[in-house]
Every structure is written in structure tokens, then in C-alpha cells.
Amino acid sequence: MVNQLEMLYEGKAKKIYATDKEDMVIVHYKDDATAFNGEKKAQIESKGVLNNEITSLIFEMLNKEGIKTHFVEKLNDRDQLCKKVEIVPLEVIVRNVAAGSMAKRLGLEEGYELKTTVFELSYKDDSLGDPLINDYHAVGIGATTFEELNKIYEITAKVNEILKEAFKKQNINLIDFKLEFGRYKGEILLADEISPDTCRFWDAKTGEKMDKDRFRRDMGNVINGYREVLNRLRN
């Protein structure tokens, strides 16, 4: 049993709390929804509960598959116990199908099947709008090393294969998603969350969107999309 202490950090969708175990934190999932680098904001009732449950199920699955993550256990509807990592200030964006900003940037039709999975890298800095960078930028600015980045890409590729297969069984196409990583006792761990906030999930038969695009694009029924992902994951 761990006890929650002071809040260490508050982000757009989560709060991080210290605990009486030095190497553990409590991650609390909020109902806040944001898009376009915080320009669009709303409260969506139960979003935090659903994202906590979805992320917990996915991290449990990845842990069983040998992927090392920061996730320890789900504590309650909104809280997880996680290892206290030093976050690598990068996001790895995995694109299996062209959608969103990539489709717009490259003049591709949404839904275009990419000839190979594309990894993109962004520098985590809200004031800069999380700009896309390349491997040399990432190493050059001191965010990582080539050795660490190779390890991150290796884990990312494995996670993509595991998740694509798992969601395919539930008639969900994993279009794209973002991952974050942290350093913990000399190792690189998968961190943050994997949820409809961080992934694009399309129904394999209808193409219906079941993710944060419903909020970004004012499509309505945001929470129903999240709930549908959870219901299928539980099967």
C-alpha cells in the first residue's frame, strides 16, 4: 500500500503525485480534453475513468508480452501506481495509415495505406508546439543519444506489432498513435498512456472514428467512442 503525497506535476490530461515510496508515483486521470496544443478545451465526463481503464489493460498486456513499462497497477477508477521515470522529452508518432496532420502536411488522402510504417519524432515543448524533429536534432539538442533512440525505436516497433494484432482481433484498425518513454534505473521504459487520447482507432468495417478526433472535429458522441474501444478490449 502506498500513500499519496504532494502533486509533482499537472499536465493537460493527468496529474502526477509523489508517494511515500521514492521510486513510485500516482498518475491521476482527469476529464479535461484538449486539442490543437491546448487551444480547444472541454470537460468530458468519465473520460479520465475510461482512459485509465484502457491504458491499464493495454499496459498489462504489453508487460505480459515482455515490453517494460512504467505501469505497476491500477489503484482505482482514476489512479494508477507507476514507476517514477525521468521522461525523455520526445514523442514517437507511429503511423500505419495516413491521417491527421501527416495527411494534411504531405497532401495525402486520409486512409491512404502507407507502404511502410512511418516513425516521426516530435520535441516535447508546448511553447514551441511540439515541433517535428529528426534523430540528429534529438541527439544534437541533448534530448537523447543515438543508442537510446535506437532502443526507443526497437521498443516502438514491437509495441506497434502487438497492438495492431490485438486491435485487429476486435475489428479496430490502429491508424496511428504516439508513445513516450522514460528512464528508470538505467533502463528505458514505455511511459505515459495509450488510449483514445493518444491513438487513432477506426472501426475496421465502417471506418467510424473511436478516438479524440471526435472531439477535435466536433463529431459528437466523444465518450461513446472511448467506451466502445474499452468494451471491445474487454472481450
Curated annotation (Swiss-Prot):
It comes from the Bacteria. GO terms for molecular function: ATP binding; phosphoribosylaminoimidazolesuccinocarboxamide synthase activity. Pathway: Purine metabolism; IMP biosynthesis via de novo pathway; 5-amino-1-(5-phospho-D-ribosyl)imidazole-4-carboxamide from 5-amino-1-(5-phospho-D-ribosyl)imidazole-4-carboxylate: step 1/2. Its EC number is 6.3.2.6. SUPFAM superfamilies: SAICAR synthase-like (SSF56104). Belongs to the SAICAR synthetase family. This is Phosphoribosylaminoimidazole-succinocarboxamide synthase. The gene is purC.
